[in-house]
Amino acid sequence: DTESRVDFTNGFTESYGDPLGMKASWESIVNFKDIAATERTKKLSANAQWFEDNSPVDGRFKKEKVKGISAKVITAAILGGDLYPSTAIGINLPNSNWVRKEYGSKSVTIGNITDAYNKAAHGNGFLNEYVIDKSTLDNINKYGDACDELHTDLHECLGHGSGKLLPGVDPDSLKAY
């Protein structure tokens, strides 16, 4: 389902915490779609083939036909299990490579969590200490949050949705690395 305004995930979903990648941890999220921000991710998804074709990657690792990338930005209303109290800023399902290859992927950016992390980082002194000059600092303060949101969208929509493994390569060969 890619059209619902309210959605949820509830169950044993992610296997990152298991070194063998076999047991998943339980997580739950109830959310609603951020319509305006979702338009931004839809533009990226609609152009996924262009990004794939023009990426600076050996052609053996490029998908000939990118398909089924759906993307949205959500506002998390409730988090539980492995998603609480600290959650990721994005979700990409399914985890199975063969399902992704056959049907595509569902990319989600959790907008209110990204916004909260960005706000928490403001005023902590890091930028004042390490940014080279006032002009650069002004640009970071003006555009930094928007750039961070776009970076997350690019990662979720195109990073997880791009590329392919060579024939015979086990998708779990790197385990938790």
What spans do the regions from the language model cover?
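Active-site recognition of the HExxH zinc-binding catalytic motif
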Residues: L150-K164
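Post-HEXXH active-site segment of zinc metalloproteases
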Residues: G163-Y177
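A generic secondary-structure signal for well-formed alpha-helical elements
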Residues: E52-S55, G161, L165
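Intrinsic structural disorder
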Residues: D1, H151-H155, Y177
